[in-house]
Amino acid sequence: MSAALFSLDGPARGAPWTAEPAAFYEPGRAGKPGRGAEPAASAMYDDESAIDFSAYIDSMAAVPTLELCHDELFADLFNSNHKAGALELLPGGPARLGGPGPAPRPLKREPDWGDGDAPGSLLPAQVAACAQTVVSLAAAAQPTPPASPEPPRRSPAPPAPGPARDKAAGKRGPDRGSPEYRQRRERNNIAVRKSRDKAKRRNQEMQQKLVELSAENEKLQQRVEQLTRDLAGLRRFFKQLPGAPFLPGAGAADAR
């Protein structure tokens, strides 16, 4: 019994470990450590095959993130009936439950992922498609800088409706061929002529007034020149006269 347990658990002490998978889910080992191995254990281990996850680990390491592809990535890997598999893996099969039952089905052999013709070869293609999708989404999420700043376009504001605009919209003039329109045109022409004539008369009056003021200015300048000459003659006259004999106040003061 001890020799059988030692041979199932692994090699002898000091020997290198092999790459064969360990029996982690053997029901007889976990509950009763002292119970011997059953004859069905060898057949169960013969049907088992190891799965190499190195290809998937490398592909997952190359992809930035596979959050969007987790369901698709592991859907085919673990898509099996675990309840039926557990019943088949138990030593004795359905016969242990008691009573005659259906014949035990053969164990499902895991497909070889390295074989290109097997149905499981679709999983690497799914991983590659998920990687391309994630890379494209990451590239699309990066913000692109604007090419050139464009000036903001301002939409023309609609004119505010006012009382004058409402009156102009509500009041429409007569037709151009009607006599009322002609009469209004004649009145407008007469008013324009009168305003023009009035402006001309004002211009002529201002020109005439300018001429008169210019003539008066010349006369005033001549008057100023005449007064300046008279003042100069009077100064010369008073400078030539003696000052003492002609002062009556000075003579009266001396007599006293």
Swiss-Prot record:
Compositional bias segments (type: Basic and acidic residues): 164-188
Gene Ontology terms, MF aspect: DNA-binding transcription factor activity, RNA polymerase II-specific; RNA polymerase II cis-regulatory region sequence-specific DNA binding
GO BP terms in the entry: DNA-templated transcription; regulation of cell differentiation; regulation of transcription by RNA polymerase II
Annotated Pfam families: bZIP_2 (PF07716)
Region (Leucine-zipper): 213-241
Record keywords: Acetylation, Activator, DNA-binding, Isopeptide bond, Nucleus, Transcription, Transcription regulation, Ubl conjugation
Ranges annotated as biased composition (Pro residues): 143-162
Cited CDD domains: bZIP_CEBPD
UniProt cross-references to PROSITE patterns, sorted A to Z: BZIP
UniProt crosslink position (Glycyl lysine isopeptide (Lys-Gly) (interchain with G-Cter in SUMO)): 108
Compartment(s) where it occurs, according to its Swiss-Prot or TrEMBL record: Nucleus
Ranges of residues in domain bZIP: 178-241
Region annotation (Disordered) ranges: 18-40, 92-121, 139-206
Gene Ontology CC annotations of this record: nucleus
Region annotation Basic motif: where it falls in the sequence: 182-209
Modified residues (N-acetylserine): 2
Keyword Ubl conjugation: yes
Oligomer and partners: Binds DNA as a homodimer and as a heterodimer. Can form stable heterodimers with CEBPB. Can form stable heterodimers with CEBPA and CEBPE. Directly interacts with SPI1/PU.1; this interaction does not affect DNA-binding properties of each partner. Interacts with PRDM16.
Entry's family note: Belongs to the bZIP family. C/EBP subfamily.
Function of the protein: Transcription activator that recognizes two different DNA motifs: the CCAAT homology common to many promoters and the enhanced core homology common to many enhancers. Important transcription factor regulating the expression of genes involved in immune and inflammatory responses. Transcriptional activator that enhances IL6 transcription alone and as heterodimer with CEBPB.
Record-given protein name: CCAAT/enhancer-binding protein delta
Organism of derivation: Bos taurus
Lineage summary: Eukaryota, Metazoa, Chordata, Craniata, Vertebrata
